[in-house]
Amino acid sequence: MKSNKEINVAIVGASGLVGQKFIQILQERKFPIKNLFLFASEKSAGDKIIFNGNEYVIDKLEDNSFQKNKIDLALFSAGATISKKFAPIASCTGCIVIDNSSAWRMDKTVPLIIPEVNPKDILSHKGIIANPNCSTIQALVALKPLHDVFKIKRVVISTYQAVSGAGNQGIKDLENGAKNIEQKKFRYPIFNNCIPQIDTFNDFGYTKEELKLVNETQKIFHENIKVTATAVRIPVKNCHSEAINVEFENSFDMGNIIAVLE
């Protein structure tokens, strides 16, 4: 698709925190949209959103939504279950799907893309393109230029993730905690607290969030780099942070590192 050609675009999960950010960025960057279609669950159907000064109504996502509306590009952020069901339906109509969930990230037939890191991998797509976990993106954008020069041997990543990573309800829980209102999203109190668990634990003591960092890093770099990770939820609305310890195969000094990152 050429950037100056207007296309039909769909947002799946338009009522969610990420879906709303999709809409904001499309508007800010003046993306060449011919027709915009907003989809979400039945609960959000009928809600209205303003885009480029026009009012759009959110529709319930249906099996025929993509074929009926001749959608060229669909941005999915409605969770893995929805993506697993509807992304193949959309791609079969000729629509290109960019999926923000974990549904397709580790599928061998689906490229996992960070534009600043592995853009050429997108050429292998068959209709579905996955983007990594937010913390993976944050880490690898910084690590890629270092890996190219010094070759990474081992990485230890500690992430400190804002409640926005848990969606609108995560933000509400933080705000409600200050008012002593019972929270709904987090198992433990998040107000004035750090929770050293994001998602469920496996038998080895890693959470799903931590394993995403391990597996996605190896897939994107196409190498079996040793990675270990810790993920902590912290009581701030936005902005994740990370502390990364890296072991390289090639020799270096700090001046080399700074020069590469600059």
Role assignments for model-derived ranges:
Residues 1-190, 226, 254-255, 259:
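N-terminal Rossmann-like NAD(P) cofactor-binding subdomain of oxidoreductases
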Residues 74, 163-262:
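Charged docking surfaces used in two-component/phosphorelay signaling
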